[in-house]
């Protein structure tokens, strides 16, 4: 993870020079695919969770689960469109808080983890050792390329949804570099690889807030959660259905942000064919991963993500197919 993070960071020095590979047609397609692939996860969260043991629970999908998710969605809509200022901007957060409170009143919140959590803890670097595994490093580096493509799409979606403009080369390079450094730091402390959080594309598109100060404040809060486990435990105690209500809105907004970018595309036969083939292979392989069962495991993981084949096809076809002036 550490070396893969450094590789990801290095991609930031080149990604800006490849900006012409990601016009609105490609960037919008990437964001649309991300959003469409995330929506089923949001539905599963609202129903009670996406893990197998949660889905196999007889209570999965019952009204109490969906009721909490709907509370979050309804409160978020009310706050977004019937209030102004900070209340409107914080609509999703207020919806989550309302859903959390309702869940507590319904007795669906277990605070046992909060009681057991420490008040203060310092992360230990390389707690699990440092194992140099060439195969694992190559795998993480390949996934870093996929993550970098997702980052380009996410940054493009953020600038389009939050400021109604295209992302600059500096923004693309900086975002990719920051993702890589974050992954490297996560590897030092035994964490998982980082990637840009596509849900935030929807959140920023909905709120219109893309201030670095706001993001930095959120980062400080996350650090506090890491250093003060009780704070993190309180958040972790939130029922998955409450979170599901929020992410349904955000995942849907991700897809909407991609559609918004595609609205700027001239829809001639060339561009329609690029979208059709890229979308078909991207979503098709994601929905039917068994179609790849005779490929090596690494190839299956990369192609079944849907994002890589969709982005690769869109980039290649956009570069090789001749331009058309008329729709």
Enumerate the language-model features and the residues they cover.
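Membrane-embedded alpha-helical modules
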Residues: 2-109, 219-327
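Helix-loop-helix hairpins and the membrane-proximal interhelical loops
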Residues: 54-59, 88-173, 296-299
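Short alpha-helical transmembrane interface motifs in multi-pass membrane proteins
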Residues: 60, 138-142, 181-186, 240-244
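Membrane-interfacial loop-to-helix junctions in multi-pass transporters
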Residues: 66-67, 128-136, 166-175, 209-213, ...
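Alpha-helix initiation and N-capping motif
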Residues: 119, 178, 197, 228-231
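Membrane-embedded helical hairpins/re-entrant loop segments and their flanking transmembrane helices
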Residues: 141-212
């Amino acid at each position: 993870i550490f070396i893969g993070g450094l590789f990801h960071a290095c991609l930031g020095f080149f990604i800006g020079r490849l900006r012409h590979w990601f016009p609105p047609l490609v960037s919008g397609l990437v964001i649309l695919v991300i959003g469409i692939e995330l929506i089923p996860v949001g539905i599963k969260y609202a129903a009670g969770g996406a893990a197998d043991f949660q889905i196999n629970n007889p209570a999965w999908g019952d009204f109490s689960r969906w009721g909490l998710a709907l509370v979050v969605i309804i409160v978020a809509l009310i706050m977004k469109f019937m209030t102004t200022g900070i209340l409107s901007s914080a609509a999703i957060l207020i919806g989550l808080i309302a859903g959390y409170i309702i869940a507590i009143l319904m007795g669906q919140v277990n605070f046992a983890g909060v009681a057991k959590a420490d008040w203060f803890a310092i992360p230990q670097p390389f707690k699990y050792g440092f194992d140099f595994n060439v195969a694992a490093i190559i795998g993480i580096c390949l996934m870093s390329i996929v993550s970098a493509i997702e980052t380009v799409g996410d940054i493009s979606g953020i600038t389009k949804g939050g400021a109604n403009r295209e992302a600059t080369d500096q923004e693309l390079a900086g975002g990719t570099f920051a993702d890589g450094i974050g992954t490297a730091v996560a590897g030092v402390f035994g964490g998982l690889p980082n990637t840009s959080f596509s849900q935030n594309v929807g959140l920023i598109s909905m709120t219109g807030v893309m201030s670095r100060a706001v993001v930095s404040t959120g980062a400080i809060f996350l650090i506090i959660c890491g250093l003060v486990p009780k704070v993190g435990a309180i958040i972790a105690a939130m029922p998955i259905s409450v979170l599901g209500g929020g992410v349904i809105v955000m995942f849907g907004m991700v897809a909407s942000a991609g559609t918004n970018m595609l609205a700027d595309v001239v829809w001639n036969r060339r561009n329609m064919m690029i979208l059709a083939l890229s979308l078909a292979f991207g979503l098709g392989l994601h929905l039917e991963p068994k179609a790849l069962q005779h490929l090596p495991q690494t190839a299956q993981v990369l192609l079944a993500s849907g994002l890589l084949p969709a982005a690769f096809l869109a980039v290649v076809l956009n570069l090789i197919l001749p331009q058309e002036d008329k729709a």
